[in-house]
Amino acid sequence: MSKDGMEMFGVLDLETSFEGCRFAIGIRNGNNKRFRLACTVGLRVFVCHNLAFRGDYSPVLAKHSKHFSLEDALSIGVDRMQRNFEPMRQQVEGWRAQQLSATAAKLTIYRAFIEADLEVPRHLARSVHELYFNPQHEEFQPRTMWSLSNAFTSAFKELDPIPQFRASAKLGKFLGAVPAS
């Protein structure tokens, strides 16, 4: 919830899981007309509780009115998001298999923060670097895109909830554009 109570971001953890991850639905809403109720598919990593999202938030086709049902809107949104489960699982498997050289990892971090290819606070660059090259969890020891993704999402935990959700929602697209090294 934003400080003024006009914007809300949240996560629904789902029962569907695979190899150390549980699917989740990211939800946002703005009563200040900044954005409509929208959902995106994501996942939560069991070992560290990191959140990662796939794609942008998709609006739920409903206007705020006295007849609006949040339960119905979320039901429709969850149904739509389930179509992204398999592509997201495949992306994770691809990232787990995608080896990164130290140079490629450093260049990706540089592009994210110094060249501002990822809209996130620059002060997180050092945290991402440290979390990738000195991982806190054994699962992230391999030098892969998956480990780098989790370094980013772990660093994002330093942010307040709303900026954390925004950063997490943009990360997948950014990392998806990184060429294999």
Specify the residue positions occupied by each region the protein language model found.
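Amphipathic alpha-helical segments
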Residues: 1-2
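Intrinsically disordered, low-complexity regions enriched in serine/threonine
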Residues: 13-181
